[in-house]
């Protein structure tokens, strides 16, 4: 029989084709979700009142700051006004940079003025050339500031890098300086937040993973992408069968707020993973959806959280619309119910500097309503 001779090369060719397809897929450049390719709205010329704010002094000192929960017990749920003021003073230049980059990139994507692009890039290159935020001397609050800052800047920069208007085409030297700096910071963030015991893995680790995911796409580094996905899976497997995060339940009266605060980085990571062919929604039997549903139910009626940990919930933070910016990526991953969509539309646009600015512009541009909303992310 001649059949086996015919089958053998056919199987071999199939294997070769399969391996070539795998190699092509493996080497495909990392990309953000679709909305990040949006072009600049208008290329405005002529008179303008844009002023580039003074660039804050690059922070090159050790990353050791007081915690705003200083003196609180293990629950870390009681703010210390004195230490919070000290923390905000010490980190002012860092948060000024975060907010500034996010704000100016949003303005540039709206107006397209060269001065705005110059401003945003100068802010980042100034800090990059100073090796800012790279200190190996840090405490928990310090390494937290590093990952927040990286996430804020890299996710704003995504808008420039992937826009169909190609604003960085003639700014490659600046781009290389900025991206090399982001890459170094991401390596340090991975080091800062790796190999923690499960009882220490909470929203901070999720935000660290978001900063690394955003930087992975900016720098096209699959190793960073894989680390962020791995951290997401750890987070997903912390969500219990009822949608609670046990480590955030420890935050007593702030448990619901911290569950809500855990959602933005997780929803963004899942959205970015999806854009690159990795579906994280099934992880731990749909953990992200379970967590989102639990938080949305808790916002409507916080009694379930109070019953679960014995504490009446502090709803102060949950009255701020930008705290629900996670609904943009979340409702792109899942079919949100009509009442959730109605609530989302009432709160839009969602502008939060820790996620790179205006997420409504990226995920739901038909519901963009101009300048409504504070670029809040604190």
From Swiss-Prot:
Cellular compartments annotated: Periplasm
Binding sites annotated in the UniProt record for substrate: 67-68, 140-141, 258
Gene that produces this protein: algL
Primary role: Catalyzes the depolymerization of alginate by cleaving the beta-1,4 glycosidic bond between two adjacent sugar residues via a beta-elimination mechanism. May serve to degrade mislocalized alginate that is trapped in the periplasmic space.
Enzyme class per UniProt: lyase
Family of this protein: Belongs to the polysaccharide lyase 5 family.
EC number: 4.2.2.3
Organism of this sequence: Pseudomonas syringae pv. tomato (strain ATCC BAA-871 / DC3000)
Statement: the UniProt record of this protein carries the keyword Metal-binding: no
The protein's name: Alginate lyase
